[in-house]
Amino acid sequence: MLANENSLLTMFRELGSGKLPLQIEQFERGKTIFFPGDPAERVYLLVKGAVKLSRVYESGEEITVALLRENSVFGVLSLLTGQRSDRFYHAVAFTPVQLFSVPIEFMQKALIERPELANVMLQGLSSRILQTEMMIETLAHRDMGSRLVSFLLILCRDFGIPSPDGITIDLKLSHQAIAEAIGSTRVTVTRLLGDLRESKLIAIHKKRITVFNPVALSQQFS
């Protein structure tokens, strides 16, 4: 966990112990946290798990723009614009999650009273913008093998834990969940993961993926 993430979680806990009405919410995997068009009434801090943010288009196509890790803040568009607005993204629990949520008007006051909170939040948002750019680049690949590899490398960066064999992605990932994230099908993802296992680039144990050598994996479809 990064220092600024520690600070952010600590600040939210401190705010919750004061006058700020901090609410704890839990969602099972696949449950919607908010839909596009919902009124933006609360700001969220992800305490445990992972949340998928996606953009839904009129055609029905849904594109993943970010996969948020623990200690990420989201639902903050109104804070950035200074105006009340509706939700822009579809937020879904990618794994079972626990959230802190705060009414947006109270969060606005807290940012004025504690400027350091704004600075820490800005650092977190900068990291998310980088991940969104990487996700867009991932989805630009027409080849599903390249798309899957790019996605696994993003997960190594944001959810990876060093292990004796390489980098273990600290998420339980079903083939269906991966397929939904990269715009593929479960059958295709199962086949591609099988190919990577046969090539001894990854291992899968209890739905957790270990990448033996991220550099070698990145060269798989280059």
Swiss-Prot record:
A nucleoside 3',5'-cyclic phosphate binds at residues 6-128. CDD domains: CAP_ED (cd00038), HTH_CRP (cd00092). InterPro entries: cNMP-bd_dom (IPR000595), cNMP-bd_dom_sf (IPR018490), Env_Response_Regulators (IPR050397), HTH_CRP (IPR012318), RmlC-like_jellyroll (IPR014710), Tscrpt_reg_HTH_Crp-type_CS (IPR018335), Tscrpt_reg_NtcA (IPR022299), WH-like_DNA-bd_sf (IPR036388). Required for full expression of proteins subject to ammonium repression. Transcriptional activator of genes subject to nitrogen control. This is Global nitrogen regulator. Keywords: Activator, DNA-binding, Transcription, Transcription regulation. Pfam families: cNMP_binding (PF00027), HTH_Crp_2 (PF13545). Residues 142-215 form the HTH crp-type domain. GO terms for cellular component: cytosol. SUPFAM superfamilies: cAMP-binding domain-like (SSF51206), Winged helix' DNA-binding domain (SSF46785). GO terms for molecular function: DNA binding; DNA-binding transcription factor activity. The keyword Transcription applies. Residues 175-194 bind DNA. The keyword Zinc does not apply.
